[in-house]
């Protein structure tokens, strides 16, 4: 009987210890601790990311070949593409589009895009925008969700609209 009482008392103490730890892990945050991020701002950016898959200095490299030779499906490509605020490839670079794209469609050219727009100049220097979504390359407009960010874009949410401005199959860009 004494052992039963000790076990019961130990269970009660353990329950209270776990319950009090649980309260500390999931507490509501006071808005004053968010600093400059407590107010939402709307920012509209127009950037151009220049993807090059071949040539002397490709910005994207396939690291996993397709599973089947009949489609790109299953291939994985890592990218570190220059970002600019203007169309020409020789425009001033303001950051990098870094991440990967995975060929995830069998009947079309469709990719799962996982990337950060990492800005390296101006007021956005050191900030990133994180994008995760589906990119069907042959569609005129592709929409992908913004799932977060860092720096000035902390707590970012929204969407990206991708449009192909130019495509040169021979040059690979």
Swiss-Prot record:
Where on the tree of life does the source sit, at the highest rank? Eukaryota
Please give the InterPro entries that the UniProt record associates with this protein: Allene_oxi_cyc_Dirigent, Dirigent
A biological process (GO) of this protein is:
phenylpropanoid biosynthetic process
Q: Which family does it belong to?
A: Belongs to the plant dirigent protein family.
- The name on file for this protein is Dirigent protein 8
Q: A cellular component term (GO) from this record?
A: apoplast
Instruction: Assign the protein's first listed, main location to one coarse class.
Output: secreted
Name its cellular compartments: Secreted, Extracellular space, Apoplast
Q: What is the recorded function of this protein according to its Swiss-Prot or TrEMBL entry? A: Dirigent proteins impart stereoselectivity on the phenoxy radical-coupling reaction, yielding optically active lignans from two molecules of coniferyl alcohol in the biosynthesis of lignans, flavonolignans, and alkaloids and thus plays a central role in plant secondary metabolism.
The organism that produces this protein has a lineage beginning with: Eukaryota, Viridiplantae, Streptophyta, Embryophyta, Tracheophyta
Question: Quaternary state and partners of this protein?
Answer: Homodimer.
Q: Which UniProt keywords apply?
A: Apoplast, Glycoprotein, Secreted, Signal
Q: Specify the signal sequence span.
A: 1-22
Residues linked to a glycan: 69, 90, 125
Pfam families with a match to the protein in the record? Dirigent (PF03018)
